[in-house]
A protein has these predicted regions:
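H-loop/switch region of ABC-family ATPase nucleotide-binding domains
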Residues: 139-140
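Conserved ABC ATPase signature
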Residues: 78-82, 86
């Protein structure tokens, strides 16, 4: 049961981009009847976009993020015709259009096959390491997420934990949750 709270972002300057968000996939999203281009481009609307039309800068940003995620060749395809992994890459490109610093990912690999999951984890790792994007990920896929994380925030009743992956693997919380698997 959620309690309450707030998130305060360190927003600096007029041109600061906000936080990008990749929601957990729903059936409604999977059936969305827009082109890949339209979905990705809609991400710039989070950036204090007051004009009802997209400008050259918006389009260049969308194209850059599509290239970064290797989906430029899908530009004209209908979003709902894509595989689950491709759809997640499209939504990740859209989220990147909204930020250059922080991404919040909600269960990003849910519903993906193992190969697509690992590919998405590698993409997320590259965004963090090469693009210096902070990643905050909510996941039940702890065993795989541990391989890509630097820190873990585990919230469970009165067994909360925050620390490095190594500290987590040695903790009682990890042993209870993973049955010692993380310590192998």
């Amino acid at each position: 049961k959620p309690l309450n709270g707030e998130v305060i972002a360190n927003v600096q300057g007029k041109n600061h981009k906000g936080v990008g968000y990749l929601p957990q996939q729903t059936q409604a999203q999977k059936d969305f009847p827009a082109s890949v281009w339209e979905v990705v481009l809609s991400g710039v609307l989070n950036n204090d976009h007051r004009c009802p039309f997209y400008n050259k800068k918006d389009k260049a940003e969308a194209e850059k993020n599509m290239e970064k995620l290797n989906i430029l060749d899908l530009k004209k395809r209908c979003y709902r015709e894509l595989s689950g992994g491709q759809q997640q890459r499209v939504l990740l490109a859209r989220a990147l259009c909204a930020t250059d610093s922080v991404l919040i990912l909600d269960e990003p690999v849910t519903g993906l096959d193992p190969a697509a999951s690992m590919e998405l984890y590698e993409t997320i790792k590259d965004l963090n390491k090469k693009e210096n994007v902070t990643i905050i990920m909510v996941s039940h896929d702890i065993k795989n997420a541990l391989n890509y994380a630097t820190h873990i925030l585990h919230l469970e009743q009165e067994k909360d934990f925050f620390g490095t992956v190594e500290e987590y693997k040695k903790s009682n919380v990890s042993n209870m949750f993973l049955g010692g698997v993380a310590n192998d």
